[in-house]
Amino acid sequence: MALQQVRPTNKQCRKNKKRAKAKMMESPRRLCRWAIISYEGSPRIACNATDETAESPFLRNRERSSCINRGFDISYCVRCAFTPDEHCVWEPCCAIQSVRQQVEVGTSKRTMDIYSPLQFCFRVTGLRVSAVIRLEYVQALFSQPISKVDQVSVGTVTNTITTLSNTIQQSISDKLAILFQSLALLLAAFIIAFKYSWALTLVTSSALLFVVVGCSVTLPFMTKIQQKIDKADEKHSSIAAEVFGSIRTVISLGAQESLSKRYTTWVEEARKRGNGLSLIFGIHFALVFFALYASFSLAFWFGLKLYREGHIGEINTVITVFFSVMIVVSVLGNIASPLIIVSKAASAAGSFFELIDSEKVDSGGLREPDASAHVDIIFRDVRFTYPTRPDVPVLKGLDIRFQNGKTTALVGPSGSGKSTIVALIERWYQLAMSPEDQNQGSIYVGPHDINSLDLKWWRSQIGLVQQEPFLFNDTIFNNVAFGLIGTQWEKEPDSVKKELIEKACREAFAEEFIQRLPEGYATIVGQNGIKLSGGQRQRLAIARSIVKEPKILILDEATSAIDVRGEKIVQAALDRVSRNRTTIMIAHRLSTIRRADHIVVMKGGVNVEEGTHEELLQREGGVYRDLVNAQRLELLAEEDSHTGNAVLELQDEAQSPTMSVQEKLQDEDNTQDKNRGFIRTIGLVLYEQRARWPLYVAVLISTAGAGTAFPLQSWLFAKLIEVFRFTGQKLVDAANFWALMFFLLALAVGVLYSTVGFTANSLSVRISEACRKEYFQNILAKPIPFHDLSENASGSIVSRLATDPKQVQELIGLNGAFPLISTFSMIGCIAIAFSFGWKLSLVTVFAALPCTFLAAFMRIRYELQFEAMNAAVYAGSSQFAAEAIDAFRTVSSLTMEDAILDRYTQLLREQQKKAFRKARYATLIFAFSDSVELCAMALTFWYGGQLLASREYQPTSFFVIFMAIIQGGQSAGQFFSFASNFAQAAASANRILNSRPQSDELGAASIEKQQLVRSGDLTGATVEFHDVSFRYASQDVPLFTGLNVSIQSGQFVAFVGPSGCGKTTVISLLERFYSPSQGTITFNGEDIRTLEMTSYRRELSLVAQEPRLFEGSIRENITLGLDQSEFTEEELIQACKDAEIHDFITSLPEGYATELGIKAQTSLSGGQRQRLCIARALLRKPSLLLLDEATSSLDSQSEKVVQGAMERLAQKRSLTIVAVAHRLATIQKADTIYVFGTAHAGQASRIVEQGTHQELLRAKGTYWQMVSSPRFLT
């Protein structure tokens, strides 16, 4: 509260005179002017200033000189300090008035009533801006052509919507509030300074102009380097997304080390680029803080010069301008760090707007009734190459007509262009509109060019089932209901939708396994449907495509992962829904397309044969006939005699290979996580990086030195006030000396802050690098059940990897250095205050300190809670966005863009509501913490006045203490402004530390394991299952019990059975993804749990049902997980020849060096990817080869060649093969075939038959019924 100015009465003057035991001159026309003067210890009275002399500052100066010449030492004016008179002419009195005025200016800007809504508004604004810009980014991404989306990795998207959006949010919520508040104070200080002396203000501002020029030079460099750092962060986030999105492949290949090196390379690159900021920060802070403190020296020196020359009439003008400059310096010092954060936010915003402002796909056009889907689809001379491989033509003048209401099948070798036709029909790619482009030709839908149709309307007419179906991490009900988007049923109530969904699931043969799930249609399927088997996922995808009764149905290997009985039923359902609608089928299993109205045989990007099944079979030497012959079994069951009675008793197991995996692990994991306090957490991180102690020492010394600048400034200011005791040359000499001292302080501060900027950033990027490497390694070392938990989905992990080390870096860097400076400043201010006057310091410090610490505790505690809430919500929204981008083709084909954006908006809105409620109460805490310093100032000023009035304190002591309290209060305020950074860094550091192996994991790892040593001769492995039982945590019934299997060295063993019966689980147990609940599995006579993991997995090779490739060249993908010394070039080429992929690779312009790009999964066809994975598996020269539907995506010719190569290796006894297959033609030469089944619902799965292909056919049991299915007949 501002002090009121009260003109003293003569009665008050007489009272004061009596107290001083002195005489005072009285006159009706004169005001009371008096001071207690100290001279050689004796109090004296001095009185000066008449109405006449008050008119002239020069007379006052002369009269002042005469007083001093008479022996009076004018030190201070008690009365004017607290009952000020605007006409007072005594310089010390004026100095105290100036102090009071400037305190009023500062305090008026930061009252609780103003600060509370200010902080609240900025926090809410930051949350909303962050949410809106993320939503705009995702929306813009969905509006891009798929050719551009293929160039954006999931890791880049995750990094952008987490790390970069958090930077923007923090900048607005915390730093921008400080910036605007400081700018307002800056403007007020300049207005006051200009009001008192424009000349002095302008000259002083020249030093500040130096700050502006310096910032204009350094900030562009900061932004440029920050953008390079962001690019490096995107790269390592992209690698992390690939790794954790394909974690089973990575672990099975033993590729953790090689992929970690890739990740580490870009982490180190980010550190190197971050080091480039160290020098820029050093220069930036040197220029800024030197100029700021030099402005003190300039203001005082030039002000005294103007005063002596008579251009300034009163010394309080100099003091007022000086204080204004001090406020400006304090403000600019406080915004130095926020300014850097704002520049980072500007760089982050650039990454957002680069995509947001890019050109969008024009989705408008014709729709019903102007256009219709009940027409022919015609390809005319279509030529097409993918943007990622412009030198490799895919379609070469293709002409095809898909007749309305008819079923057209596309068959042919992998890579012949079948899926490309689907992509063009879905308008994921567009043919050229100009003759210069090599993508030429036309696609017509009836009379209309396909590009003239409304994009969303056209896609809503199509039901698509892809070869690798994608399910969202949602319920089964919602996953199927997504197929209703864009139809007349989209807005119907759930009761209506339920009927449609249940009908579609029945037709897709999915209802049977859904009903056996504990939660039925409400079951969460996990990331990409990980909690369901491949066949179950495919059936749900079929249900999703047929639920809307589309006019056009496209089936791209729609039944490849479904078991024999399931495929038969589903195929019959597809045949029914295909009637009277345009259907396009792509298949390698020719039995599924034999009833097609028209079959087109593709080869080399053109159609080489067309006709019906019967017509094509009659062509001697025809391509189609050769494909059919390649799929015949050696011994066929009677074709139709038992078909009608082939009702199997097999039933799908209710639980899938990864159904709600290890839910108890989640509870255990949560109990093991430790929520350490802030000091302990950061202290532990710093302690573990103690090898960097030289940087620690440099940061500590430089921040301590910078922190002493404020206390020294307080002392220097008091000395400057004492200068006014002198006159003449002595005044000039003293003024020049102390101005020089301020200049030397400016030099020292410039050097110290430069050191702070350089060393703090250098330290932070190194510790961040170490934390990020360790974090990645720790999560990569987690077992598969950890990754199966929903909160540990790949998107969430990538989000944490991108954000957590960054938060630690922010705190240990400049955001940690400035609080350190504030801490040392507070300590220094308290120390210097006590040294000049213990009584005033004691009262002020111990009255304010408890409130200060209470406010700090409350604020940091709130920020920790707020950060924990934010982290949980952002992880969910980021995972959702990453999942949607990863499934871009599925989202676009279902026209789910608006639904995805609505759901994403809902997630963000929920987060905003929670944050809004938190912020509403938190701003009161913020206001309280920032008001404590103001209360300390007021208390100091009041109690100091009492001490001055009682003549216990000299003015110098009062000024030093008061200035120290002001500076200490400002330091406390700056310290509190970093509370959010403390909370975020503590939460992030806790997650990093909690990712480390727990005590039980370390105990298990410390047990000595047997190391497997590879011999020179390649021999197969002997594997045995002894009474093995296995149950997932969520299952009441084991998946299987008492499993006994014996696989001899060099044998080819196959497992068949319905989807979900446990076939893939056998593979997972052999790979040690999971451990058996009971029983043992031996490898060459040794329990696999006693074998060292890495050497054991080196003996295995796995080819999964869904092949996974990584960014890099073809060579790098094939040799992934292998050291260069483990294979020769000849062995590499032979493995590719055995996998029937060598010819394709050599046909590419760059051969084995061909880069697969960011989206490696979409750069090749399914069959090409699968053959590369087979080549990768063969190159490892395993003793045990695991095949999980390994040839499901291959055409018949390729499959026959690949199968023959593996059979030859098995015959040589050089490896043992364990295969899981639905396509029985691939396992007819197996030494032993194990047939899984379930006796009754609710019981564990079991092996119902075993034997060779011929033995099982003669037994005419379950296997014979499978073979009797028409899918194996030509």
Swiss-Prot record:
Pfam families to which the protein is assigned, alphabetical: ABC_membrane, ABC_tran
Q: Which UniProt keywords apply?
A: ATP-binding, Cell membrane, Glycoprotein, Membrane, Nucleotide-binding, Repeat, Transmembrane, Transmembrane helix, Transport
Q: Which SMART domains match?
A: AAA
The record's induction entry says:
Expression is induced upon voriconazole treatment.
**A biological process from GO:** transmembrane transport
Q: Which residues form the ABC transporter domain?
A: 377-629, 1023-1269
- Please report any disulfide bonds recorded for this protein chain, giving both cysteine positions: none
- Any idea where the ABC transmembrane type-1 domain is? 120-344, 697-984
Quote the cellular component terms of the Gene Ontology held in the record: membrane; plasma membrane
Q: How does it sit in the membrane?
A: Multi-pass membrane protein
PROSITE patterns given in the database record: ABC_TM1F (PS50929), ABC_TRANSPORTER_1 (PS00211), ABC_TRANSPORTER_2 (PS50893)
Transmembrane segments annotated in the record for this chain:
183-203, 205-225, 280-300, 321-341, 697-717, 737-757, 818-838, 840-860, 924-944
Q: Does the keyword Signal apply?
A: no
Localization per record: Cell membrane
> What residues bind ATP, as annotated?
412-419, 1057-1064
The UniProt entry, under InterPro entries, shows: AAA+_ATPase, ABC1_TM_dom, ABC1_TM_sf, ABC_transporter-like_ATP-bd, ABC_transporter-like_CS, P-loop_NTPase, Type_1_exporter
Q: Which GO terms describe its molecular function?
A: ABC-type transporter activity; ATP binding; ATP hydrolysis activity; ATPase-coupled transmembrane transporter activity
Hey, which family's this protein in?
Belongs to the ABC transporter superfamily. ABCB family. Multidrug resistance exporter (TC 3.A.1.201) subfamily.
Free-text function comment from the UniProt entry: Pleiotropic ABC efflux transporter that may be involved in A.fumigatus adaptation to azoles such as vorizonazole.
Its protein name is ABC multidrug transporter E
Annotated organism of origin: Aspergillus fumigatus (strain ATCC MYA-4609 / CBS 101355 / FGSC A1100 / Af293)
